[in-house]
Amino acid sequence: MKVSRYDYTSKCVSLLLLSILFPLHLYAQTNTVELKVVDADNGNGIEAATVQWKPIGAPSFKNGALTNRRGIVQIQAKGVDSYVVLTRYVGYETAIDTLKSSIKKYTIRLRANARELDGVVVTGKSKVQFMRESPEAITVINGKDLQGRSVSLETILDKTIGLKVGQTGGLGSSSRIIVHGLEGNRIQILWDGIPMSISDGTFSLDEIPIDIIERIEVYKSIIPARFGCDGLGGAVNIVTKEFSTDYLDASYELGSYQTHKGSVFSRKNFPKSGILLGAGGYYTSAKNDYSFRVPERENLLVKRDHDRFRSYMLKGKVAFTKLWFDEISTEFGYYNRFNEIQGVLKNIQHAENKSGMFMLENKLIKSGMLNDRLNFESHFSLSHTTNNFVDTARVNHDFEGNIYPSPNGQGETGDVPHNSNDKGLEINERINLDYKLSTNHSLNLNTLINYAQRQPNDDIASQHAGFIIGGFPSKKTSIVSGLTWEAKLFGRKLTNMFSAKYFHLHSEIEDLTSYEMIEAPKKKSNTTSQIGWIEAMKYEPFRGFHLKVSYQRAIRLPNSQELFGDGIITFPAAGLKPEKSHNFNLGFLIDKNDVLGLSRLQFEVNGFYMQVSDMIKLMKQHMAAGYVNAEKVHIKGIETELKLDISPTVYAYGNLTYQDVRDVLDYLPGTQAPNPTKGLRLPNIPYLFANFGAEYHSDRLFKNWYVKAFWDGKFTEEFFYFWELTELQKRRIPRSFVNDIGLLLTYKNKYSIALECHNLMNKEVWDQFRQPLAGRTFHLKFRYVFSKGIL
């Protein structure tokens, strides 16, 4: 009988699988027990909990391990019928369980220790504390400190050491994050470790509901390879909450200038089937109609009467947790945004922008493979965006109330009218592998593949200009892959992290050779590859003192907006090169309990130095602008922060940042003409700023009530908003000092009300590009939480 090629191949594959699985089956006969440590209230796995075990009757616990990020640890109890398991974690009561050796899986539920949670300082380290003590220059903001507050994410970030948020207006306005003197696209924004596409202005951070945040990680002058992304100045990783139990979180906020924010997030768990369903969304709107003095005409006070903003997002999720994978989940959502265009130097009354985005995400997680050594995670995301910018008015306005015909026939914002219909597609696939070599050595491999394409269309603009002004269909593919080796040496006093990163970019752009004439577009391609690396060390000579040093050869690939343009005022730029930087950090962290009469003292100092080349800059070209590699910058600075738990109920903090960002380019791009701005500070980047505040909090002032009252102050020194080449050019943003106060009341961990006043003294504040910000504002927020433990 003749054996087909298919049968032969099937037998070979079967034998191969048998040879692999049979030894694993034999190994599985050994007495290995999987323990999962969870929060008794919400069912979430607890990472870094200490688990120790011993045979019944043994005098002491000699074996121990820490749970992984999902709260799981595997132990081996050989030669005994029963054994005792001791589980501890800071803020929770110690659990003691007696197990029979026949048990293969067991869940340990830890209950919160009420005394410890009331402010009494305890020994041990939380997830936030573990991260703060990592070798990277990092600041971690605990989401628990933000819950229930009537404040935006941008406001929280703006008070962080080493970080500044440049704003242009009220809710929904464009903003940029500045870390160690680098800003905008050079700072990566991540959502649960996945890069967010917000550089095109489709989405703004101040829309994100603060109550869904678990923590915020701010990496400064360094971007860990485990994120698989590029960037120069650092990264902000927003980590959201995950709950394994049923919950409902609903809030509504009312603020000045007709600001409204509402959000609802829910989750339903079916523990027997391992199915988890989630749904939620938010809505934000604001009129932003505050008054301001027109720059360069400061005796003219006008009202922002064309700055209305509205957005909403709807999301749904289904997850399976009892399959071979620890989690298989699919998440889908839709985002919609509308905003009017407010003029500052010019009175714009008709231009507006509408955009939408459909999102799909899929996640696969498997941990504990290869004898609890290998963890795997795959994250796939797809987003499809549409954008419609409308500027077709035939009349223009000035701030004195005069109306006159548009100088260009149509339009208010530029040289040509617009009615765009742009479409974009972006696909990401991230694969992350963690492998534990030994107790003190581990490897991490992370690869992020990104594909983006853009299809612009603006017939009105093209007809008016005489050529295709919105650009042509374009696409790009990028790959960022990083391998990290982490070693803990000398009794775990020294932690060393070394990473190598590979960057690859290929773009295909249809563009015109010259915008001065009508011609057929030509396809231009650009391919580049770069290597970067990171070396970071932390040394802890004694408990509570950490010395950190790090270096990164940083690379940032041009993003979609820079390569493709925006179809409105920015042309494509096919020949862009990656930005490059040498980043250095040196600092120390002190964290001590019960010292100098204080419950806790935290003090840190960090110095940084960076050499940046091939910086991408927007430059004017004919009727629009395009991005070019045109800047070279050196940055040096220092930051320091002091946090004091004066008592279990009183807390105070203060931080100060100084950063000197200088242009060091010798000649103007493409010429031998001397650069007139060499040696000058870059405009729109504050060089000296500070934050400080105090807080009182207690859950014993009134029965069943948690009370928090706080004051925050923010100081920013005067800085330039444009180059000052002569003494006569006073292009400066004045010094500012702003105070915020607030009160938060929470009843039985379910109902909360927050009242806040921002800019208490109603100071006049200007920000980047001399944009006027709102004066005193009031905010009132109500929140209801169904699930205990969500706060």
Language model regions located:
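Short, acidic, small-residue-rich periplasmic hinge/interaction motif at the N-terminus
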Residues: 38-42, 49-54, 86-92, 103-147, ...
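Extracytoplasmic beta-strand/coil segments of soluble accessory domains associated
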Residues: 138, 154-195
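Short acidic/polar hinge/loop motifs at secondary-structure boundaries
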Residues: 194-221
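Short strand-turn segments of transmembrane beta-barrel domains in outer membranes
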Residues: 217, 224-225, 235, 241-269, ...
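Periplasmic-side early beta-strands and strand-to-turn transitions of outer-membrane beta-barrels
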Residues: 245, 253, 270-351
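Membrane-embedded beta-barrel scaffold of Gram-negative outer-membrane proteins
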Residues: 273, 286, 377-379, 540, ...
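Face-selective signature of the C-terminal outer-membrane beta-barrel domain
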Residues: 319-336, 355-517, 522-543, 550-552, ...
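Gram-negative outer-membrane beta-barrel transporters
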Residues: 493, 503-505, 600-611, 628-720
